[in-house]
């Protein structure tokens, strides 16, 4: 069973004027207080009502609590999804399993390549985490900048991937 929840996962909505982006779209796992429920989906009714203003979904990394709801919710949003090479590879596998891979526009982000989408300029910045290829996002508009980290840790000797980009973090 997949009930919606307002506190189920990582999903963030960012607005500038009449334009929206989402950062992450994850699931949460139910506990013993919810027998018969395996996962919880985020409540996205608010953004569904503004779907025509939604420019895209940006993923910080490939953990389920950050991207696990896409296979269940994408049909309601139908926007491009952006992520690192590793995150997109994980998402492709999930989308293929449910027959959505050919329908979803997936765009790979690269560090220091700024993505211009509507009024947003989004710059991925390398971090480290317990999964390869995570990004923080520097989201800029004419009115200012938001720095969205997602999950992270500082690891100067990662087994996979790059060290955090300390220069960009300054």
Question: Language-model features: where?
Answer:
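Active-site metal-binding loops of divalent metal-dependent hydrolases
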Residues: 25-28, 86, 128-130, 150-152
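Metallo-beta-lactamase
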Residues: 86-134, 140-142
């Amino acid at each position: 069973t997949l009930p919606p929840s307002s506190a189920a996962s990582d999903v963030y909505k960012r607005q500038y004027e009449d334009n929206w982006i989402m950062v992450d779209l994850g699931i949460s796992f139910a506990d013993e207080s919810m027998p018969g429920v395996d996962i919880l989906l985020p409540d996205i009714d608010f953004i569904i009502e503004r779907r025509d203003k939604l420019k895209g979904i940006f993923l910080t990394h490939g953990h389920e609590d950050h991207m696990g709801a896409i296979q269940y919710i994408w049909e309601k949003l139908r926007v491009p999804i952006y992520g690192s090479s590793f995150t997109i590879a994980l998402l492709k596998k999930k989308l293929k399993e449910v027959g959505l891979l050919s329908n979803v526009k997936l765009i790979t982000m690269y560090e220091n390549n700024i993505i211009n989408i509507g009024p947003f300029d989004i710059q991925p910045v390398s971090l480290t985490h317990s999964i390869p290829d995570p990004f923080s996002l520097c989201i800029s508009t004419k009115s200012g900048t938001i720095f969205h980290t997602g999950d992270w840790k500082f690891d100067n000797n990662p087994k996979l991937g790059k060290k955090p980009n300390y220069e960009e973090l300054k």
